[in-house]
Amino acid sequence: MATQTVENSSRSGPRRTAVGDLLKPLNSEYGKVAPGWGTTPLMGIAMALFAVFLSIILEIYNSSLLLDQISMN
């Protein structure tokens, strides 16, 4: 038989630790979703600004955007 059941094993379930007790409140809202869009527009704005930042860095790196104060050797 491929499977075996172990009865009266020494393992008695998960242990309680100090770190687990500290992190427990963070997991208490698991599965609950607030109705509506929430902070989605704010995240969209942050992503757009980050994309603009990355494109500026890429243009500086490719020397398509020349700045007088920055010398690229």
Curated annotation (Swiss-Prot):
NCBIfam families, A to Z: PRK02624.1
Post-translational modification comment from the UniProt entry: Phosphorylation is a light-dependent reaction catalyzed by a membrane-bound kinase; phosphorylation occurs on Thr residue(s) in the N-terminus of the protein.
HAMAP family in UniProt: PSII_PsbH (MF_00752)
Positions where Phosphothreonine occurs in the chain: 3, 5
Polar residues biased stretches: 1-12
Keyword Chloroplast: yes
Membrane topology annotation: Single-pass membrane protein
Cytoplasm listed as a keyword: no
Function: One of the components of the core complex of photosystem II (PSII), required for its stability and/or assembly. PSII is a light-driven water:plastoquinone oxidoreductase that uses light energy to abstract electrons from H(2)O, generating O(2) and a proton gradient subsequently used for ATP formation. It consists of a core antenna complex that captures photons, and an electron transfer chain that converts photonic excitation into a charge separation.
Protein name: Photosystem II reaction center protein H
UniProt keyword terms in alphabetical order: Chloroplast, Membrane, Phosphoprotein, Photosynthesis, Photosystem II, Plastid, Thylakoid, Transmembrane, Transmembrane helix
A single GO BP: photosynthesis
Description of how the protein assembles with itself and partners: PSII is composed of 1 copy each of membrane proteins PsbA, PsbB, PsbC, PsbD, PsbE, PsbF, PsbH, PsbI, PsbJ, PsbK, PsbL, PsbM, PsbT, PsbX, PsbY, PsbZ, Psb30/Ycf12, at least 3 peripheral proteins of the oxygen-evolving complex and a large number of cofactors. It forms dimeric complexes.
Location of the region described as Disordered in the Swiss-Prot/TrEMBL record: 1-20
Membrane-spanning parts: 41-61
Pfam families: PsbH
Record localization: Plastid, Chloroplast thylakoid membrane
Family: Belongs to the PsbH family.
GO CC aspect terms: chloroplast thylakoid membrane; photosystem II
Top-level taxonomy: Eukaryota, Viridiplantae, Streptophyta, Embryophyta, Tracheophyta
Database matches in PANTHER family: PHOTOSYSTEM II REACTION CENTER PROTEIN H
GO MF term list: phosphate ion binding
